[in-house]
Amino acid sequence: MSLKGKFFAFLPNPNTSSNKFFKSILEKKGATIVSSIQNCLQSSRKEVVILIEDSFVDSDMHLTQKDIFQREAGLNDVDEFLGKIEQSGIQCVKTSCITKWVQNDKFAFQKDDLIKFQPSIIVISDNADDGQSSTDKESEISTDVESERNDDSNNKDMIQASKPLKRLLQGDKGRASLVTDKTKYKNNELIIGALKRLTKKYEIEGEKFRARSYRLAKQSMENCDFNVRSGEEAHTKLRNIGPSIAKKIQVILDTGVLPGLNDSVGLEDKLKYFKNCYGIGSEIAKRWNLLNFESFCVAAKKDPEEFVSDWTILFGWSYYDDWLCKMSRNECFTHLKKVQKALRGIDPECQVELQGSYNRGYSKCGDIDLLFFKPFCNDTTELAKIMETLCIKLYKDGYIHCFLQLTPNLEKLFLKRIVERFRTAKIVGYGERKRWYSSEIIKKFFMGVKLSPRELEELKEMKNDEGTLLIEEEEEEETKLKPIDQYMSLNAKDGNYCRRLDFFCCKWDELGAGRIHYTGSKEYNRWIRILAAQKGFKLTQHGLFRNNILLESFNERRIFELLNLKYAEPEHRNIEWEKKTA
């Protein structure tokens, strides 16, 4: 297939990694890439084809999220621009059409492939994915999913296209419904369900800032102690509900629908399958989806360079199911005790403690975060060597099953396992890589670990999880490794799951600031750092500073005092922290 004499333009953002990848494909076929939006509209460019990112096109081939499209494309008026596109007769198709052209070795598209610029109406699903917590009004990003046009005639169309509101509130049998019989405020639960979906949608698509806006709005709704009756009421009475989100809330309450929410459900599922694998981020997942890869098996055959570049994906694939299973607090504590026992034999003075969601009182944890420190030791290189020695011992003892970051010493110990995974995956080309370790000295260690059968039996005999302060709402069942990908599976068949374990370290003098940082949550850390900045301070994991002068780093409570804050226990740094500090 030759594309010589063909012109293509990428919108709204030609500089994303996936678009750069597609640009290189087209250029190799002889195509010319139009870099300027204005060039698209010149009479001499009538033959240009505009390629629009799939995330801006719904299942009915309508352009959606025009406000976001306008911002990312750097346009002053998106409607005026689209009008000129239509007048000039320029054809617009989805970026994923490139995959079809390459596979068929033919440049051709049908009328059904052309993008329309009128919005479509989509019903809110009654199946809400779980999201998390909250944002400041002033930092809210416009996150409109629906069309800018919300007149009465459009609302009538939306009502006709929707399921009955009662149906939305009841939910499907076997699925988590938006509202339960115990719910006091039904409007709120309906809104929360939609915000969860929006949060998850943008998380999966790698849109961190938009996801954060919805998380924070969702948290405000969860903390709300009255039944929200309008978007305006939510905007004026609740934090983190800006005009954009208030507008959506009003549409939800009026009609039970939110245009654009479900148009990418299929895409979300495909991206989620890849993103749930350790080592795979949004960009890789999007690229593989655009190339029509539906399994790791296909990706390994057609894009082996990605696995060679980041070999940890092989272990994310191998332990896919295990690493999606959460563990009890008792199991976290059992892992801590095992590490502490081994550590005493290496350096009795060095100490280690649990951080993360365990420290915040969660009943279930996705992984284990351990913080290492040593009284009066401010040499993190010394701590790094202690952790490396500990890792070597625990690997030889059979506790560590895989490393996800290497030093030269760990590479010598573990390289055979990496090679074995490449061979099992039938990936070639790894022999050309000369070095597998990331650095001579690393101060963070990531790994997969397993308890012994005896420890697992002892764990089963424990009755209650001590220290549980927060029981999360049930999430939907996570994805499972597809049958075509099972040949790489090292997942447990006896219930003894491989667990993700992370080692961190901090200087003795920075212990207080380090504990704040590694306890989390991410939203709490962001909030307290913004608050510190507003008061003229700078807070990091290394301490509290003013004018680059360290004020406090060791005493955690003193840091709160200097910020004029009441000390927040770790369990108060979860989703309810904002309500307590408002």
Curated annotation (Swiss-Prot):
The keyword Magnesium applies. Residues 135-155 have a biased composition (Basic and acidic residues). It is found in: Nucleus. The keyword Cell division does not apply. Residues 127-161 are annotated as: Disordered. Keywords: DNA damage, DNA repair, DNA-directed DNA polymerase, Magnesium, Metal-binding, Nucleotidyltransferase, Nucleus, Transferase. One of its GO terms (molecular function) is metal ion binding. GO terms for biological process: base-excision repair; double-strand break repair; double-strand break repair via nonhomologous end joining. Changing D367E: Loss of nucleotidyl transfer. It holds the Pfam family DNA_pol_B_thumb. It is an enzyme of class 2 (transferase). Mg(2+) binds at D367, D369, D502. Its cofactor is Mg(2+). Its main location: nucleus. Induction: During meiosis. Stimulated by the interaction with the DNL4-LIF1 complex. It catalyses: DNA(n) + a 2'-deoxyribonucleoside 5'-triphosphate = DNA(n+1) + diphosphate. GO terms for cellular component: nucleus. Residues 360-369 are annotated as: Involved in ssDNA binding. Gene3D superfamilies: Beta Polymerase, domain 2, DNA polymerase beta, N-terminal domain-like, DNA polymerase, thumb domain. It comes from the Eukaryota. Belongs to the DNA polymerase type-X family. PANTHER family: DNA POLYMERASE BETA (PTHR11276:SF42), DNA POLYMERASE TYPE-X FAMILY MEMBER (PTHR11276). Repair polymerase. Involved in gap-filling in DNA nonhomologous end joining (NHEJ) required for double-strand break repair. Seems to conduct DNA synthesis in a stepwise distributive fashion rather than in a processive fashion as for other DNA polymerases. Preferentially acts upon short gaps formed by the alignment of linear duplexes with complementary single-strand ends. Required for filling gaps that need removal of a 5'- or 3'-terminal mismatch, however lacks nuclease activities. This is DNA polymerase IV. It comes from Saccharomyces cerevisiae (strain ATCC 204508 / S288c). The gene is POL4.
